[in-house]
């Protein structure tokens, strides 16, 4: 099992390197230095986003013990869209476009983190609070934020409506260098901090009762891991925009491909698959569709179809 898992990680690493090299070198124009620099920045953003979404989804699915749910159910994606739309609604699109990139990144990340912490604080005041109650509240807030966003989009100037709509699509083509390094630093710090809990993931995957019986301080560990999920989701969303179905797609492909219960194998594999997926789809957007579509549309279409497939497959098992 260990030898097979090592071989699979090596194969995924090689595929990731090949896909990164292909993205960097494919169809370079005459002014290749400028194009190479832009592509390198996009690749760094892809690596940050892919790793952050993979780790956040892996932690979240381990905690809730469900392979269909993703961190987007907490409503953070909807809150991100609400923040950006509210700025356009209150101050105009020119204010949003002229804002300091780092200030906007910190504002979005800070508000998403503040929302998560307040939510966790009130929901986990009581011991033994059911995690699924948190998911229910997250769905309610996500719907509420989405409704507010739609309400403001209806009222704003039609010329600014398109800008508000563009915010909802993830993009790796307008990455700010300063934000990139801030996001990278946060990602590295979060991954390093999470390493001390990787050994707990295998136990948490067995369920709450088994985890408690095996000596895990469940409530404390749950709070810390959910905070890590909020940090990773906030950073990736504030950096490039929402990618709703990426985590769902990557996690299920990882489990089907690796078939190993150990999270020290699953997490690196999920990160590599996430990066490969984003690179290949960015290649499609750039060179096949020539920017006539967006990365979000491709990810959400494929992820949505796969989500329906998972539901149908689960329904067959229950029949």
For each feature predicted by the language model, list its residue ranges.
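Alpha-helical transmembrane segments in inner-membrane proteins
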Residues: 1-319
């Amino acid at each position: 099992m260990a030898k097979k898992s090592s071989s699979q990680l090596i194969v995924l690493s090689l595929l990731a390197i090949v896909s990164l090299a292909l993205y960097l070198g494919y169809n370079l124009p005459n002014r290749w230095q400028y194009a190479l620099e832009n592509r390198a920045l996009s690749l760094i953003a892809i690596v940050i986003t892919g790793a952050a979404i993979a780790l956040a989804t892996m932690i979240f699915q381990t905690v809730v013990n469900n392979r269909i749910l993703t961190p987007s159910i907490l409503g953070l994606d909807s809150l991100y869209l609400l923040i950006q739309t509210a700025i356009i609604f209150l101050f105009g699109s020119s204010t949003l476009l002229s804002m300091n990139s780092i200030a906007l990144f910190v504002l979005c990340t800070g508000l998403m983190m503040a929302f998560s912490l307040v939510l966790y604080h009130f929901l986990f005041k009581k011991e033994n609070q059911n995690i699924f109650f948190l998911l229910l509240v997250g769905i309610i807030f996500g719907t509420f934020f989405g409704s507010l966003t739609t309400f403001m989009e209806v009222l704003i100037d039609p010329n600014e409506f398109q800008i508000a709509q563009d915010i909802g699509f993830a993009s790796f083509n307008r990455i700010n260098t300063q934000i990139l390094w801030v996001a990278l630093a946060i990602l590295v710090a979060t991954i390093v901090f999470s390493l001390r809990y990787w050994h707990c993931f295998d136990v948490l995957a067995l369920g709450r009762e088994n985890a408690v019986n095996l000596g895990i301080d469940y409530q404390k560990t749950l709070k810390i891991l959910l905070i890590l999920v909020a940090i990773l989701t906030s950073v990736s969303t504030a950096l490039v925009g929402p990618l709703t179905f990426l985590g769902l797609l990557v996690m299920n492909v990882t489990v089907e491909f690796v078939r190993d219960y150990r999270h020290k194998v699953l997490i690196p594999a999920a990160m590599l698959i996430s990066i490969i997926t984003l690179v290949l789809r960015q290649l499609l957007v750039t060179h096949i569709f020539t920017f006539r579509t967006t990365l979000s549309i491709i990810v959400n279409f494929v992820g949505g179809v796969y989500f329906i497939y998972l539901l149908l497959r689960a329904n067959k098992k229950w029949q």
